[in-house]
Amino acid sequence: MEALLQQSRAMCPFLKRSSPNTLRSLATATRPSTSPGGGTMTNLQRIARRCPVMSKALAVQSARMTGTKRFTSSAAGVPGAGAGTPKPTRGSPGKRALHSTGGNGANMSTEFHKGAQQIHPGLSNATRSHVGASATVSGPTPRAPVAAPFDYDAFYNAELQKKHQDKSYRYFNNINRLAQEFPRAHTASKDEKVTVWCSNDYLGMGRNPEVLATMHKTLDTYGAGAGGTRNISGHNQHAVSLENTLAKLHGKEAALVFSSCFVANDATLATLGSKMPDCVILSDSLNHASMIQGIRHSGAKKMVFKHNDLVDLETKLASLPLHVPKIIAFESVYSMCGSIAPIEAICDLADKYGAITFLDEVHAVGMYGPHGAGVAEHLDYEIYASQDTANPLSTKGTVMDRINIITGTLGKAYGCVGGYIAGSAALVDTIRSLAPGFIFTTSLPPATMAGADTAIRYQARHQQDRILQQLHTRAVKQSFKDLDIPVIPNPSHIVPLLVGDAELAKQASDKLLEEHGIYVQAINYPTVPRGEERLRITPTPGHTQELRDHLVEAVNTVWNDLGIKRASDWKAMGGFVGVGVEAAELENQPIWTDAQLNMRPDETLEAAVEREFQAAVPGMKAGGAKAKPVGSIAANPIGASIPVAAAA
């Protein structure tokens, strides 16, 4: 009681200046209430009614007591109390009536209900007698509240119905990629094989012999799982080695591995944004959901700048005081349109306005740069090409060196799973120590980390896969352009075909799969804005000329069958998202130059592809892979065969 009084005095000036004797006297002296039927009141209550805080508390207390009295009267059988109120049923009309799917209410069985009344054998005798007496008290039981409970199933069904109505419901195709027949897969039936044209395993590293051998050996030695979080038995030599490799790849002091890059982005932005005082995060309008989620979780102020718009970004930076901490969050390659950020110019703005940069290289690591470190490395290609690995001493001032935080994935070009951040030792240690997304989750399995480490080292030594993938991408884009099929212009390895309608995109994807044995996933809202629906194609080193010809022929047929707009149609309408806009074509030249792709003067694209593919064959044999074609395309009308990817 004394502790409660001390706490109350700290909050209330009246209690603070009144002595205990005065309070006791006021609390015991009573007089009739001024309210009809209000009984008596203490003098302390009368004084409290004049207090702006206590008067509200007393009003709430009075309302609760009144409600309790009414409920007790109804339970005691007072005539008219609660009479005529129908008992709610799950089958009654309401939200559920809006849906075609119905359901029967779940009823508790009588036997189960009886069993629930039994007294636990562990109770003491005194407690048994008390519980028994309480259970046998005669009289009616209180009625349940008259309001109907929330209909959870109706809520779920309503949300799903919205997705169906706007054609954004996501369907999942059963696609089982075959390691020895890359880029082939079988569907739910092993006899039904298709060619996968939308995988993010961009280089086929998911079936690379060196990676698989490392994973097999590690799995046999160290088992399936890590055994715990990084702090509790889940930290091991594989994590240490992988993080050292990643830090070296990006020329940073340290790196930290997460279960995915979604978690890495979310955890890092949420932690920095919430811990830095008055932090402001400036985010590109096309940023990935993981970054948007992290910014939201941070609670920091957010400013969204127009996609790749340096003027808009600088305007927003200039509006903020120099002393305020600022994070510019953006991506190098935007995966759904293939655009590439002006990284160096953003670094210039960050330096000018006292901001730090957060660069997501998820769709670029393994794909760009002499060692596969991403677009930031690629922008200084010649400097890094002369290095065995990124050397911080000799690469000071390069674009990659200027980036404060780099995030990437192990699950796309490296063919495994997981995500990471790389930066200064102080930054990485801060995230390691404060980010719940890192602290409270199980570490990646040893075999996964060892496999990813091997994949990164492999791609740092070999340019062949990146070059072949880029040549195949050029060939596919050119073939579509020749047939007036609308490719959204971009300088990267992404091939987005504009459809512009959610239902048509789904139909096109279905027809390619069912009639041509080609798997390309439709991309709809919210991944892309409504009206910008598309098919997203990602060539790999394993997509040979026969496979490319089959794809282009099939897409052309589907476009004709469904009457989907051609590039010339979009041009006649004034152009859209770069399609049908000549300036957009000129501005989006490939980031890989002819010289970087080892193309010879006057050499045709197909000749360069064939030469690079043949150059990859000895390496494939040395890696233990078959150099000759394996498997056949069951649904391919041209009867092509699939060679093992050069990535092997």
From Swiss-Prot:
The active site is at K412. Residues 1-26 form a transit peptide. One of its GO terms (biological process) is positive regulation of organelle assembly. It catalyses: succinyl-CoA + glycine + H(+) = 5-aminolevulinate + CO2 + CoA. InterPro entries: 4pyrrol_synth_NH2levulA_synth (IPR010961), Aminotrans_II_pyridoxalP_BS (IPR001917), Aminotransferase_I/II_large (IPR004839), AON_synthase_class-II (IPR050087), PyrdxlP-dep_Trfase (IPR015424), PyrdxlP-dep_Trfase_major (IPR015421), PyrdxlP-dep_Trfase_small (IPR015422). Its cofactor is pyridoxal 5'-phosphate. Its EC number is 2.3.1.37. Keywords: Acyltransferase, Heme biosynthesis, Mitochondrion, Pyridoxal phosphate, Transferase, Transit peptide. Residues 69-109 are annotated as: Disordered. Pfam families: Aminotran_1_2. The keyword Mitochondrion applies. The modification N6-(pyridoxal phosphate)lysine is found at K412. It is an enzyme of class 2 (transferase). Gene3D superfamilies: Aspartate Aminotransferase, domain 1 (3.90.1150.10), Type I PLP-dependent aspartate aminotransferase-like (Major domain) (3.40.640.10). It is found in: Mitochondrion matrix. Disulfide bonds: none annotated. GO terms for cellular component: mitochondrial matrix; mitochondrion. Homodimer. PANTHER family: 2-AMINO-3-KETOBUTYRATE COENZYME A LIGASE, MITOCHONDRIAL, CLASS II AMINOTRANSFERASE/8-AMINO-7-OXONONANOATE SYNTHASE. Belongs to the class-II pyridoxal-phosphate-dependent aminotransferase family. This is 5-aminolevulinate synthase, mitochondrial. It comes from Emericella nidulans (strain FGSC A4 / ATCC 38163 / CBS 112.46 / NRRL 194 / M139). The lineage of its organism: Eukaryota, Fungi, Dikarya, Ascomycota, Pezizomycotina.
